[in-house]
């Protein structure tokens, strides 16, 4: 659920430390706390560990998921042209390769012809992206 009261809160935003904890657990690591999850993220190259409570954008989340996949030995060479999305110019240079991979793998498909890369990554987005990654 993620919250003490058992709620998932799908519309809540995803923070960096939440992402680090989930990805660390997915890798088989069992961090005892957020500080250990942060260190795991740094050690694996998923993140530089900055701004743990910072809210993630969709492109930031997908970039860290891409780095996670790479750190796990997943072939991340798939790519799709982003120019078919009306807001492709809004994709940050650091995130282009990751979003291209995520689009090619069906992890992200956009909505109404847009990727919304700068939009807030909700917990629902994270759950969908992670499901598609795990089952793709």
Residue positions per predicted region:
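Feature responds to low-complexity, polar/acidic, surface-exposed segments characteristic
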Residues: 1-60, 65-95, 109-121, 132-136
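Phosphate/pyrophosphate-binding loop motifs in nucleotide- or prenyl diphosphate-using proteins
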Residues: 106
């Amino acid at each position: 659920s993620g919250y003490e009261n058992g709620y998932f809160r799908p519309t809540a935003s995803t923070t960096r430390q939440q992402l680090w904890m989930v990805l660390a657990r997915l890798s088989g690591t069992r961090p005892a706390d957020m500080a250990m999850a942060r260190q795991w993220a740094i050690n694996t190259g998923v993140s530089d560990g900055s701004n743990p409570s910072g809210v993630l954008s969709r492109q930031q989340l997908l970039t860290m998921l891409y780095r996670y996949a790479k750190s796990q030995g997943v072939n991340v060479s798939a790519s799709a042209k982003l120019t078919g999305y009306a807001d492709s110019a809004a994709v940050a240079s650091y995130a282009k390769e990751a979003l291209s991979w995520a689009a090619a793998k069906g992890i992200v498909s956009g909505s109404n012809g847009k990727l919304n890369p700068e939009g807030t990554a909700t917990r629902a987005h994270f759950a969908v992206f992670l499901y598609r990654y795990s089952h793709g």
